[in-house]
């Protein structure tokens, strides 16, 4: 009984978090973008591992707060190594869990008086990464990437570094989105839901040309970067997690993330003298505030310009 209203809790007591998440992945996740779907499956795996055994009725704010703190402090992997998770990773895991409860209460008729995730503190957003590649690191990375047998891996890394596109934007590209005559790529489905057109450098154009003209390309898919056919016969975006991990290890760059290639690309746009508006048009940053982490580059450039004024 909550505020004079009787709530039937039987369904919440019988459905586990694991069962609810698997239903969510079947019914809700497929309605989202492909890149979001992959991320939700990964987050659900962590939630199931740590909270899956509890019923929806039993999972309270205290247990969720313990999960939050444990993930931030670091849980032990299969090799016995403690791996802390970033604030943003934990925030996203909690966001998925929260939406699971919202859907269960509003759409599945699960009798719960409140979403328990709403009663806990979320980790503060982490500071933006500022990882850049040195010339020596880039040389080592390219040596490792070029040694990989599948050329799609090399093309994807090159395009990421030349264009600043996100991984999901690159791996889900269709042939119709690339116009090599005009040297542009049209992105319809982006992280911030705003379509944009990305200009291509000569190096990026060469990578796309090689990808589209390569004899390994099967005729039955319009994906530019494709994997092997699934059980249903369909090809899905190329996955190269292991290749990237191996390349980083070979290059001695274990702390370097694929998304850092985007930061490197945008930083180079700024260093090349592009205006904030031009950089935003290419990268898709929605506001000048989001580009602030790159402004220190402009400040350093201004020092030399100010010196020339006094000359």
What is each of the regions a protein language model found here?
Residues 22, 58-61, 66, 73, ...:
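Phosphate-coordinating loops and pocket residues in cytosolic domains that bind phosphorylated ligands
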Residues 143, 182, 213-219, 227-231, ...:
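C-terminal secondary-structure termini that scaffold catalytic or DNA-interacting sites
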């Amino acid at each position: 009984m909550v505020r004079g209203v009787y709530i039937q809790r039987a369904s919440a007591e019988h459905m586990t978090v694991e069962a609810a998440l698997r239903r969510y992945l079947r019914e809700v996740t497929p309605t989202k973008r492909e890149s979001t779907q992959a991320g939700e499956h990964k987050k659900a795996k962590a939630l199931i591992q740590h909270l899956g055994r509890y019923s929806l009725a039993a999972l309270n704010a205290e247990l969720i707060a313990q999960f939050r703190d444990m993930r931030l402090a670091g849980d032990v992997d299969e090799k016995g190594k403690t791996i802390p998770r970033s604030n943003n990773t934990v925030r996203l895991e909690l966001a998925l869990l929260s939406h699971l409860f919202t859907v269960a209460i509003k759409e599945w008729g699960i009798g719960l008086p409140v979403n328990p995730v709403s009663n806990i503190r979320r980790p503060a957003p982490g500071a933006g990464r500022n990882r850049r590649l040195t010339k020596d690191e880039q040389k080592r990375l390219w040596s490792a990437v070029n040694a990989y047998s599948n050329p799609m891996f090399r093309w994807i890394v090159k395009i990421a570094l030349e264009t600043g596109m996100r991984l999901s934007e690159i791996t889900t590209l269709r042939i119709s989105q690339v116009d090599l005559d005009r040297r542009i790529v049209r992105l319809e489905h982006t992280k911030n839901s705003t379509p944009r057109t990305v200009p291509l450098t000569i190096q990026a154009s060469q990578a796309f040309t090689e990808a589209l003209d390569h004899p390994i390309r099967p005729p039955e898919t319009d994906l530019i970067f494709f994997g092997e056919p699934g059980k249903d016969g369909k090809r899905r975006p190329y996955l190269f997690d292991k290749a990237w991990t191996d390349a980083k290890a070979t290059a001695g760059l274990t702390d370097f993330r694929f998304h850092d290639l985007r930061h490197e690309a945008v930083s180079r746009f700024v260093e090349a003298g592009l205006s904030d508006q031009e950089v935003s048009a290419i990268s898709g940053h929605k506001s000048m505030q989001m580009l602030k982490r790159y402004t220190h580059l402009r400040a350093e450039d201004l020092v030399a310009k100010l010196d020339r004024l006094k000359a």
